[in-house]
Amino acid sequence: MRIGMICPYSFDVPGGVQSHVLQLAEVMRTRGHLVSVLAPASPHAALPDYFVSGGRAVPIPYNGSVARLRFGPATHRKVKKWLAHGDFDVLHLHEPNAPSLSMLALNIAEGPIVATFHTSTTKSLTLTVFQGILRPMHEKIVGRIAVSDLARRWQMEALGSDAVEIPNGVDVDSFASAARLDGYPRQGKTVLFLGRYDEPRKGMAVLLDALPKVVQRFPDVQLLIVGHGDADQLRGQAGRLAAHLRFLGQVDDAGKASAMRSADVYCAPNTGGESFGIVLVEAMAAGTAVVASDLDAFRRVLRDGEVGHLVPVDPPDLQAAALADGLIAVLENDVLRERYVAAGNAAVRRYDWSVVASQIMRVYETVAGSGAKVQVAS
């Protein structure tokens, strides 16, 4: 099968959707399918040979974050050319609601079109502005996928169409077998934070507020930080506790897996804006206990606290105290921590790419059943 995929977000910056698209493309290629991926990227970006750059991206506020997207007349021409020469059996768009390559392609293309919805926000200015345009455009989508129940419900409420729920995929074995970082496990406890720590919704401020109580209980605890942000600024905010912070910066997937394998607990103190907890799944696959905010998306992944510790986020002014208590409870109780690890190991199997890719392929086969090709609309 010839599969065209479009990622709206730039591959110059790591992100969950980018990782999902890259891994899905790789799995489909190993199964013998021909895949071409169109995505924003700068000229110096290191991309596989089956990637086509849609050009440099620009930062646009989206879903409580800053997404790096590509739009405009030149991009329109590039998308049209890519579609015309692709001879695709299926076109798979990711996040077609964002002002991006995906939205452009949905407007230009017709035929067997699949779309995956990753976000669940109901406060999108983009959606408000484009809703009248999006609804008729969405009628062109033959197969709809939502990565979570939240994303599916948002799709139904905002645009009036249903979707099949297929979660994000994880290469479970690669996380389970990853080598630990040099010097780990440490003599003391290690808590891992992963994400763009300069984005408020990722919850680093909450974690810093929780840290004094955790340090009081575990004086040798280390907060291992992976991701993008201003490390010097964060050290300044941590004050006298800055010595407990270790920064790894941005890492590749192998580095992420090693960091997760090296921690006693993975902490996700997010305050909102999440539709699926893919990083929680990765941590569980690595054999690391999870302490996470009690958000709908995280609660679903952690099975209401069965496979990880959930921390109340309301009232907000008490979230840091609750997070500190949760971290201490899991760090000091080896039996509880090992129970979470064992339960997580069993729970993540449904997210393995061997399962998820097969579910997506069934959607492809359904929409491409007529034999019609993806074409540029006349």
From Swiss-Prot:
Residues annotated as binding GDP-alpha-D-mannose are: 9, 16, 196, 201-202, 251-253, 256, 274-278, 282
Pathway stated in the Swiss-Prot or TrEMBL entry? Phospholipid metabolism; phosphatidylinositol metabolism
Name of the protein this chain belongs to: Phosphatidyl-myo-inositol mannosyltransferase
Keywords attached to this Swiss-Prot or TrEMBL record, sorted alphabetically, are: Cell membrane, Glycosyltransferase, Lipid biosynthesis, Lipid metabolism, Magnesium, Membrane, Phospholipid biosynthesis, Phospholipid metabolism, Transferase, Virulence
The text of the family note is: Belongs to the glycosyltransferase group 1 family. Glycosyltransferase 4 subfamily.
**InterPro entries this protein is in?**
Glyco_trans_4-like_N, Glycosyltransferase_grp1
Q: What's this chain's function? A: Involved in the biosynthesis of phosphatidyl-myo-inositol mannosides (PIM) which are early precursors in the biosynthesis of lipomannans (LM) and lipoarabinomannans (LAM). Catalyzes the addition of a mannosyl residue from GDP-D-mannose (GDP-Man) to the position 2 of the carrier lipid phosphatidyl-myo-inositol (PI) to generate a phosphatidyl-myo-inositol bearing an alpha-1,2-linked mannose residue (PIM1). PimA plays an essential role for growth in macrophages and during both the acute and chronic phases of infection.
The top EC class is transferase
Q: Which cofactor does it need?
A: Mg(2+)
Respond yes or no to whether keyword Magnesium is given for this record: yes
Q: What happens when the gene is disrupted?
A: Cells lacking this gene are unable to produce PIM and show an increase of phosphatidyl-myo-inositol (PI).
Question: What does the entry give for GO biological process?
Answer: glycolipid biosynthetic process; phosphatidylinositol metabolic process; phospholipid biosynthetic process
Kindly state the subunit structure of this protein.
Monomer.
EC numbers on record: 2.4.1.345
Q: Where does a 1,2-diacyl-sn-glycero-3-phospho-(1D-myo-inositol) bind?
A: Q18, Y62, N63, R68
Additional note from the record: Was identified as a high-confidence drug target.
As for subcellular location, the record says:
Cell membrane
Its GO CC terms are: plasma membrane
Q: Where is this site: Important for catalytic activity?
A: H118
Under Gene Ontology molecular function, one entry of this record is: magnesium ion binding
